[in-house]
A protein has these predicted regions:
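Transmembrane beta-strand segments that form the barrel wall of outer-membrane beta-barrel proteins
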Residues: 41-50, 83-96, 102-104, 222-234, ...
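Hydrophobic, lipid-facing positions within transmembrane beta-strands of outer-membrane proteins
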Residues: 42, 58-60, 100-104, 150-156, ...
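Flexible, surface-exposed loop regions and adjacent strand-edge segments
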Residues: 135-141, 185-193, 243-244, 267, ...
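Predominantly the C-terminal beta-signal and adjacent terminal strand-loop region
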Residues: 207, 264, 327-334, 344-375
C-alpha cells in the first residue's frame, strides 16, 4: 500500500487538476492523506528496486485495499485498537543482473474484535546472487561465487492478540522449493553438487509486541518479536535445521523536533542449513548476504530531525557481525552509516517518504524509502 504513493505522484505530475485535489487544506502542501484514507479498489503500483545485491531494477504491482483506514479508526472505538486495513496485492519485477520474480499475498484481520491477524504470500523467483562463504571463506581461494535460485516460495502466519494488550502469539509456516545452481566456472567444494533441487519446509511459533504510535513511520513506542522455525523432512523438507530471530525497534521522541530510533536484531541457524538461508548482516550500505554465518547480529541508531512540519533529515549508523565459523571475538565487525531526507507525504497518517545514501565497508548504496527502513 505504501508504494502506491509513487503512482499518485506520477498521476499528479500529468494532471494539474488532480494534483490540486491532493493539496492539504491546512498548509497547501502536497499530501496524500485523503487519498490513502478513503481509497478503495485496485491500485497500480510502479516499483523501483535499489538493492545492491541484485542491482537496479523495476516492476509493477497491483494492490487492493478492502477497507479504508477511516473505517478502521471508527472500529477502534469498539475494539480499543487501530487495526491495519486488509490489503491484498501482486507484483512482477526484474533487475539488471537478470533477477526476476512474481509474487502475490496479503494481510487481513478477522474474528471477534479483530483479534486474529493473517499475513502471507506466494512467489515465483529466478534470482541471481553471490555467496561469500561462511565467515567470508569459500574454501577455494575465491572471494565469492555466483549462484541462482529458481523456484517457488511461500509463507503463512496467523497471530492472536492476547486479551486487549499489544502482544500477540502466533504460528508461521515457510516453504521453499528451489533449483539451486552454482557458477560452474568457479567450483566451491563445500557447496557441491553444482546443481540440485532443495526443498525447505519449516513451522514455528512467534511472540510479538507492537506499541508503535504509527505502523508506517513511528515516533514513539516499540515493536519486536521472538521467532523460531523448525525445518524437517517430516513436514515436506529435505533437510533438518532451525532458524531463530529476536529483534526490537524502539522509537523515542525528544526536544520536540527529534526522534531517536534504536534497532537490535539477532538471528541464528542450526543444523543442515542451506547456504542461502544462513543469517547475514542486514544494514543499509551492505549488500544483503555479503556477510553470512551461523549467527548474525546488528545494532543500529537512526536520528530523525523534523526540520519543518513537512521535511525531515535523518542520520543513521549501524554495526553488525556474523560469526560461527569463527568465535564472536575473532569475527570482523562491519560498520555502515549514512544520511537521508524525508517528506511527510501523508500528514494525517504520519507517513514519510524519501531517500538514503549509505556507505559500507566496500561500497556506497542508494535506497528509496517509504515508511520505516526497518523490517
Amino acid at each position: 500500500m505504501l508504494r502506491g504513493l509513487l503512482v499518485v505522484l506520477t498521476i499528479s505530475a500529468v494532471s494539474p487538476a488532480l494534483a490540486q485535489s491532493f493539496s492539504d487544506p491546512e498548509d497547501g502542501a502536497l499530501d496524500m492523506s485523503e487519498f490513502i484514507i478513503d481509497y478503495k479498489g485496485f491500485l497500480p503500483v510502479p516499483l523501483l528496486i535499489t538493492e545492491p545485491a541484485v542491482g537496479y531494477g523495476g516492476g509493477l504491482g497491483l494492490m487492493f485495499v478492502r477497507n479504508s483506514l477511516r473505517e478502521r479508526r471508527q472500529e477502534a472505538g469498539t475494539s480499543g485498537h487501530v487495526t491495519p486495513p486488509d490489503v491484498f496485492g501482486a507484483v512482477v519485477a526484474a533487475t539488471e543482473n537478470g533477477t526476476k520474480f512474481a509474487a502475490a499475498g496479503g494481510m487481513f484481520s478477522f474474528g471477534d474484535r479483530e483479534q486474529w491477524r493473517y499475513r502471507g504470500g506466494i512467489g515465483r523467483a529466478d534470482v541471481n546472487l553471490d555467496f561469500y562463504g561462511r565467515g567470508g571463506d569459500l574454501g577455494n581461494g575465491d572471494r565469492s561465487i555466483g549462484f541462482n535460485l529458481d523456484g517457488w516460495a511461500m509463507t503463512h502466519q496467523a497471530l492472536l492478540r492476547l486479551a486487549d494488550s499489544a502482544d500477540f502469539i502466533g504460528l508461521r509456516w515457510v516453504y521453499m522449493d528451489f533449483l539451486v545452481t552454482l557458477d560452474p566456472t568457479r567450483p566451491a567444494p563445500a557447496l557441491a553438487p553444482l546443481t540440485r533441487t532443495l526443498t525447505s519446509s519449516g513451522i514455528g511459533p512467534t511472540l510479538e509486541h507492537d506499541s508503535r504510535d504509527n505502523i508506517f513511520t513511528p515516533s514513539r513506542g516499540w515493536q519486536g518479536s521472538l521467532d523460531a522455525l523448525f525445518y524437517s523432512p517430516e513436514i515436506g523438507g529435505d533437510e533438518k535445521f532451525q532458524t531463530y530471530r529476536a529483534h526490537a525497534f524502539a522509537y523515542t521522541p525528544f526536544a520536540q523536533a527529534f526522534v531517536l530510533g534504536t534497532r537490535l536484531d539477532a538471528r541464528a541457524a542450526r543444523g543442515e542449513v542451506p547456504f542461502y538461508q544462513l543469517p547475514f548482516v542486514d544494514v543499509r550500505g551492505v549488500p544483503k548476504g555479503r556477510y553470512q554465518d551461523n549467527n548474525a547480529a546488528v545494532a543500529e541508531l537512526e536520528l530523525r530531525w523534523n526540520a519543518t512540519p513537512r521535511w525531515a533529515l535523518i542520520g543513521f549508523f549501524g554495526a553488525g557481525k556474523a560469526w560461527g565459523s569463527e568465535k564472536f571475538g575473532d569475527a570482523n565487525t562491519v560498520f555502515a552509516g549514512g544520511a537521508g531526507f524525508r517528506y511527510l507525504i501523508a500528514r494525517r497518517l504520519g507517513i514519510y517518504m524519501g531517500a538514503d545514501v549509505a556507505r559500507g565497508p566496500e561500497e556506497t548504496a542508494f535506497y528509496l524509502q517509504v515508511g520505516s527502513a526497518w523490517r
